[in-house]
Curated annotation (Swiss-Prot):
Gene behind the chain: serS
GO biological process, one term: seryl-tRNA aminoacylation
Keywords: Aminoacyl-tRNA synthetase, ATP-binding, Cytoplasm, Ligase, Nucleotide-binding, Protein biosynthesis
Protein name in the entry: Serine--tRNA ligase
Keyword Transcription regulation listed: no
UniProt cross-references to PANTHER family, sorted A to Z: SERYL-TRNA SYNTHETASE
Binding site for L-serine: T252, A253, E254, E306, T406
């Protein structure tokens, strides 16, 4: 049964070591796994030879005299004892080898730029007309080198989303949320709350129109499952655990959707399976103590629409591009200008073989901010969750590939709208594509969100 990491340690260990070096991961554990696998295969050959000997001895027994039969029966028993001991040794070595391999990150795809951190990420395309404050033009151009962006210079610098939300529009309150829930929580009111609902409806409309099945997943997962979906040792400070329970709050709908076929086989003709999930996302953000302290860009709880695909291994790279294309369609509809970035090897999460980020230009901050993360996890999650495909026509089995992408993370999309669609009087233009989802509600805003007195 194919599994990319196991195939590499057997057939091309140098390639695996190179992948680990690209991620700045010490290859020592992988080298141990290579040695364990060599030992495992050598013992397996011994076992197969012993089984053959046992079969030969057993086949001779019926034709022997009673005295000779007794000797052969004893010989067969001794062989079985040796086989049993060797099989136990095999299982122990196999478990040790696989446990090591489970700690390793996915194999980096050849098209991923090599570098230790996000400064090596490579912008590969831009879309839209960028609004750039006159004093930020050089900074903007430095972030889109070689991509020939279309941009207009504006004379006023938009207010940052945090101040726009709370001081100008007066439709958010992070101070009171901080008092009652802690930092990085928020209240959203009226027009901005309606805007969030429209974003969700719009994203679901776009993705389900492409044949993706809508799912509302569990908001918690058991420890065994979450450890299979993510590298829990690395991310244990990023996700919330329920005290006294073997349950974790999900950080994205990706995780429970990935677990939809936990320890199951999927008929090959059913693949690909496309899903779009709607859920809250809960994140500790422990590693971001001093980042984005104001506003709603980086918060502990937000709503998110997530795309997910289970595919055959040979098809996963085309579906990676499909997921990115879907996300681009959503942000093009919102008319939010963005760049797509190919994430560097040192900035990839353990699950992903390759990842794109879609980053929207934020004119008040004079920088691009991540809105979408789009990953091909190949068989990294599927092996850990034991999700296999069965192709009866071609008489083959293997592990499926899993892919995921944000469709929209509502709070981040709201921050992008507040900065990009802001007028000099503080009003915010509602994207035209969202207006049909607001028209049906009497109290919802229709064309603009305008500053108001705090109630």
């Amino acid at each position: 049964m194919s599994w990319s990491l196991l195939e590499l340690i057997r057939n091309n260990p140098d390639s695996l070591m190179e992948s680990l070096r690209k991620r700045n991961v010490n290859p020592q554990l992988a080298e141990k796994a290579v040695e364990l696998d060599k030992k495992w295969r050598a013992i397996l050959q011994e076992v197969e030879k012993l089984r053959h000997e046992h079969n030969v001895v057993s086949s001779q027994i019926p034709r022997l005299s009673p005295e000779e039969r007794k000797k052969k029966i004893e010989e067969a028993r001794n062989l079985l004892s040796i086989i049993e001991a060797k099989e136990k040794e095999l299982k122990t070595i196999e478990e040790e080898r696989d446990n090591i391999l489970r700690t390793l990150p996915n194999v980096v795809h050849e098209s991923v730029p090599v570098g230790p951190d996000d400064s090596y990420n490579v912008p590969i395309k831009v879309w839209g007309k960028f609004r750039v404050y006159e004093k930020d033009v050089n900074e903007f151009l430095s972030q889109v080198k070689g991509l020939n962006p279309d941009y207009e210079i504006i004379k006023f610098k938009p207010v940052g989303h945090a101040d726009e939300l709370e001081a100008v529009l007066k439709l958010g309150n992070t101070a009171k949320a901080g008092e009652v829930a802690g930092s990085r929580f928020y209240y959203l009111f009226e027009d901005v709350a309606w805007l969030e609902q429209a974003l969700i409806a719009y994203a679901l409309d776009v993705i389900t129109s492409k044949g993706y099945s809508l799912v509302i997943p569990p908001y918690m997962l058991r420890g065994e499952v979450i450890q299979s979906v993510i590298d829990l040792d690395t991310f244990k400070d990023a996700i919330y655990k329920i005290e006294g329970e073997d349950l974790y709050l999900i950080a994205t709908a990706e995780h429970p959707i990935a677990a939809l076929y936990f320890k199951e086989e999927i008929e090959a003709e059913r693949l690909p399976l496309r899903y779009v999930g709607l859920s809250p996302a809960f994140r500790k953000e422990a590693g971001a103590a001093n980042k984005d302290l104001k506003g709603i860009f980086r918060v502990h709880q937000f709503n998110k629409v997530e795309q997910f695909i289970f595919s055959l291994p040979e098809d996963s790279w085309k579906f990676h591009e499909e997921l990115l294309g879907n996300a681009e369609q959503i942000f093009q509809g919102l008319e939010l200008p963005y760049r797509v970035v190919n994430i560097a090897s040192g900035d990839l999460g353990a699950c992903a073989a390759k990842k794109y980020d879609l980053e929207v230009w934020m004119p008040a901050q004079a920088k691009f901010r991540e809105m979408v993360s789009c990953s091909n996890c190949t068989d990294w999650q599927a092996f850990r969750m034991k999700i296999r495909f069965v192709d009866r026509k071609k008489n083959r089995k293997g592990f499926v590939h899993t892919l995921n992408s944000t469709a929209v993370a509502t709070t981040r999309a709201i921050t992008a709208i507040l900065e990009n669609n802001q007028l000099e009087d503080g009003s915010v233009v509602i994207p035209k594509v969202l207006r049909p989802y607001l028209e049906r509600f009497q109290r919802a805003p229709k064309d603009y969100i305008t500053p108001r007195k705090k109630s």
